[in-house]
A protein has these predicted regions:
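Bacterial N-terminal signal peptides
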Residues: 5-19
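Amphipathic alpha-helical polymerization modules
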Residues: 18-165
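N-terminal secretory signal peptides that target proteins for export/translocation
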Residues: 1-2
Length: 165
């Protein structure tokens, strides 16, 4: 928390020429920078986990059961929630759960497959590569937006620290 003290000191020096700026307002500015960094990093972590789940779905998109009675891989879906963080007095993004998609499996006629039932049908995962690809692009763009936001917050912190010199 020495970082917060330094930022508060810099803001105090920076705003010392402005009589109408209070210490509380300076503290809010320092806390806002910390909150921005925490919000961005939580978003990056959440999107990173989302990309991991998507990549697992893609990697297992053709994994069938070994026998007719065994189900194939089931697509996983990640869910998020905003969680209050009292340290920064705001909400951050967290993974609330990862659940299996309960939609139907794809059936293909492959009578010679070891997992074929008595009709020759094989159950394939309920993974749609197009959906996973679109989701991964969205997750990557959201991750990149959080990186940009984090870089801006760090740049602002560095500018404040430069003012102390």
């Amino acid at each position: 928390m020495i970082y917060n003290v330094l930022i508060t000191m810099v803001l105090t020096l920076f705003f010392s020429n402005f009589n109408n700026i209070s210490f509380a307002e300076e503290r809010i500015a320092a806390d806002s920078l910390e909150a921005s960094i925490k919000i961005s990093s939580s978003g990056m972590q959440a999107q990173s986990q989302r990309l991991k789940v998507i990549s697992q779905n893609i990697a297992n998109s053709n994994v069938t059961g070994k026998t007719p009675n065994e189900n194939p891989y089931r697509r996983r879906i990640i869910f998020f929630q905003n969680v209050y963080d009292p340290k920064i007095d705001t909400k951050i993004l967290k993974v609330s759960s990862i659940q299996e998609d309960q939609s139907e499996f794809t059936l293909k006629y492959e009578p010679n497959h070891p997992a074929a039932d008595n009709r020759g049908m094989v159950k394939y995962p309920n993974v749609n590569i197009i959906i996973e690809t679109v989701d991964s692009k969205e997750a990557q763009r959201t991750f990149d937006a959080n990186v940009n936001s984090l870089e801006i917050a760090k740049t602002n912190q560095n500018k404040i620290l430069e003012l102390m010199r």
